[in-house]
Structure formats: C-alpha cells, structure tokens
C-alpha cells in the first residue's frame, strides 16, 4: 500500500534560491510520484561556507514556493537544536517525527564526488530513496531526467557582486526580497 504522503527533500544553502532549484523540484514532483517537495535550507553549512542568515534564506525559499500551487514547501527542520547540519541526522529526525511519510532525497550529479565526505551515506540510503538528478557538466550513470540548467547560487552571487541583475536566474519574488533586505550587496528598496 502506498504511504499517505511521499516527500522529496531538496537540501542546500539556498544562498540564494534560484530557478535551478525550482526546475529540479518541479521535475521530481512531475515525474517521480511524490506529493510534496520540501526545500531544506541548511542552518549552517557542514563544510563551513559563509551564508546569508537562515531567516533570510528561508524567506527567499518561501518566495520560491509561492510560485507553485502548494506542493513545494520550505522546511525549517535544520534549525532544530542539536542537529549537526548533516543530512543523515536531519533525515533520522524527520523519519522519527513522521513515520508515515516515505522520504526521498534529491541530489545533483555534481554532488556525487562529495559523497565520501558525507556522514553515514549508507544510512541515508536505508532511510530514503536517493534521487540523483543529471546536472549539466557532471555526467554520471543512473541519473534522472535531462541535464539541469547550468545555474548556481555562486554564479548568482558573482553576478550580483559585479552589479549585474540575475533576473532570469532568480524568481522575481526571491530577488525582490533580497533587494528589500539589502542581501548580497544589493541596495535596499524603500
């Protein structure tokens, strides 16, 4: 019997969230028999990268979710006290809290090279279905779907630092939020 709800988790820094995240979530929702996709911004980056504050990244993810009909949601689970920022710990907590949900994890093929550094990846595979999406420039066997758009949060931050508008890479509501709050060096809007 199919579980009541099937949820795919798309974790990341979302610093900022962009159309690549939206396209990946939309692809999984449309083709992989999941009811919801949850964006899961990291509280702190497990490898120490600097990010905008969590609340701002959550708000920009919420703006991205507003582009959908309710199947895309933002999870604040990573702000839970005691979580390490490691996927296996977050997933273990989610499984304990929601045993009726069938969990999936979405990763891009660009992440495959980092898996040896992930804590207990074998446990992640036991707790969830791991979906590896085909990211352009990172060919790998057994990936799902066509290559994803070549867009990254790093590229967007670089464009913003040069004073260029990434309007075709970041949904309007998310970039408006960033501008309103002066994130990424953007001048605040009144």
From Swiss-Prot:
Keyword hit for rRNA-binding: no
Any single biological process term in GO: NAD biosynthetic process
GO MF, one example: nicotinate-nucleotide adenylyltransferase activity
EC number: 2.7.7.18
Pathway(s) it belongs to: Cofactor biosynthesis; NAD(+) biosynthesis; deamido-NAD(+) from nicotinate D-ribonucleotide: step 1/1
Keyword Iron-sulfur applies: no
Enzyme class: transferase
SUPFAM superfamilies according to UniProt: Nucleotidylyl transferase
InterPro entries given in the database record: Cyt_trans-like, NadD/NMNAT, Rossmann-like_a/b/a_fold
Keywords assigned: ATP-binding, NAD, Nucleotide-binding, Nucleotidyltransferase, Pyridine nucleotide biosynthesis, Transferase
Catalytic activity: nicotinate beta-D-ribonucleotide + ATP + H(+) = deamido-NAD(+) + diphosphate
Lineage top rank: taxon: Bacteria
Known function: Catalyzes the reversible adenylation of nicotinate mononucleotide (NaMN) to nicotinic acid adenine dinucleotide (NaAD).
UniProt family annotation: Belongs to the NadD family.
Stated name of the protein: Probable nicotinate-nucleotide adenylyltransferase
Name of the gene encoding the protein in the UniProt record: nadD
